[in-house]
Amino acid sequence: MQDTDLKAHFANLDNKPRIIIHCQYVYGIGHFVRAVELASFLSKHFNVFLLNGGEPIMNYAVPDEVFFFQMPSLYKNENSNQLIPVDNSLDLKKCFDMRSAMIEQLVNMTCPDLLITEHFPFGLLFETEVMNLIKHIKSNNPNSKIVSSVRDVIESENGG
């Protein structure tokens, strides 16, 4: 996303505190639905920026009050357990590089007061991305807070 695109998104900002929600999922849409509902509620009192790294969900509307940013999407191949870009013209490194640039640009332009992670710390496939996001936010705003939105159910292989 270009700086001019981001500036257009910020045209309606007020003086409310700013929150970035980092949402990543590789199967299903549960994390996305949770993040959108959380963002929708929080947008009544905050400027909320939802940063989505999973596949776009076309039939689940994000409220207009939430600033939505779709990163290049990744999914996990169930057979190989490998992350794969949804856009097959990208290799994994290029996809992560593009995501990193988008995250850095958003953090620089918003200087968030709060980061909410969805699917982290349990989503260890994205540990480097989220840890870099946290470090970048803290370097821009040392007073920012970090919150983990935990909803994962860890199951054993036998379903117990």
Regions found by a protein language model. Name each.
Residues 85-128:
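Conserved nucleotide-sugar donor-binding subdomain of glycosyltransferases
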Residues 6-28, 116-119:
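Nucleotide-activated donor-dependent transferases that construct or modify glycoconjugates
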Residues 25-29, 120-126, 153-154:
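Gly/Ser/Thr-rich loops at beta-strand to alpha-helix junctions
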Residues 31-42:
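Short amphipathic alpha-helix
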Residues 15-17, 25, 41, 45, ...:
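Conserved nucleotide-sugar phosphate-binding/catalytic loop shared by glycosyltransferases and other
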